[in-house]
Amino acid sequence: MYGFFTLTQLSDTSVTFSKQAFASMNIRSLFSLFSSDLAIDLGTANTLVYAKGKGIVVNEPSIVAINKSNGEVEAVGKEAKEMLGRTPGNIVAIRPMKDGVIADFKVTERMLNYFIQKAHGRKMLVHPRIVIGVPSEITQVEKRAVIDSAYRAKASEVHLVEQAMVAAIGAGLPITEPGGNMVVDIGGGTTDVAVISLAGIVYSRSVRVAGNELDEAIIQYLKRKYNLLVGERTAEHIKMTVGSAFELEKPLTMEIKGRNLIEGVPRTITIGDDEIREALAEGISTIMNAIRVALERTPPELSADISDRGIVLTGGGGLIKNLDKRIRQETGLPVSIAEDPLACVALGIGKMLSDFKLLRRIAIE
């Protein structure tokens, strides 16, 4: 009366409206109300998960230990990496990612599900929107595999972005400005080289030579020269301790323990940085060639910008001793290493969670 609703009428109207609003929501929209958005750097060597409002909450090896007798997951991440080369016959440690893309779909799905649950404190009803970084030259089939794995791991929405682009964002480069930025992201499975301007990739190249390939080169070198067999973890440790891309001012040596392939017993040798540099030479040359090609194909105006701003290195491979010096010598350009190279991709994707306008501009799927 008097043109107003009574309390009962207002209550009835509210209930009707609520029912209509609820009915109009699709399931994904409803789940999103109770979710926390995630940014995932799904790497060949490591997976990093960035939670909106929290930062990086997961940083673990992309490894899953599976029990072959029953197909059960025994361990994921750090715990699974500890098992590499040490598992009993019925347990196998698997890297489900190879060269930056999914090699084992089912294991990747289980790994993703584990990391998503861990990022959300083991909550069961979690259906986040997810943004995932992928290599530049990924095929449609490989894209579909990443998207399907994320949905099967309970994502409500999935977006893909190029790793080189988000690595540049994570390194703090002004990618939306009308000037050239060059980033070289050396991960575990791929090296992505990109020239970026106005939030777009002007040129990009992805080569499947990166950290894991360099580790394998060390393993093969020690086999060939010393008949010494070492595992992946040891090879990675050698690479980061005495590995280099250019002659060091002060020579380094390191004791290496492994199994002699002829005698079949444990042996220890001492190796110098010059030998490991020789082992890494072919892989480093492939990366250098990708950088040279990118520079040759960059438009003149952007080349001038890169001459001023230089090249920025991201990813774990950027930490190889004197790689920046090698690139500087061969290109004549300034070279810098990002402040937190290992986290650049995850940090860059994480920024997209708060800037969906920019995400829409750079997303490739």
Predicted segments — roles?
Residues 2-186, 194-312, 318-365:
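Nucleotide/phosphate-binding catalytic cleft detector across ATP-hydrolyzing
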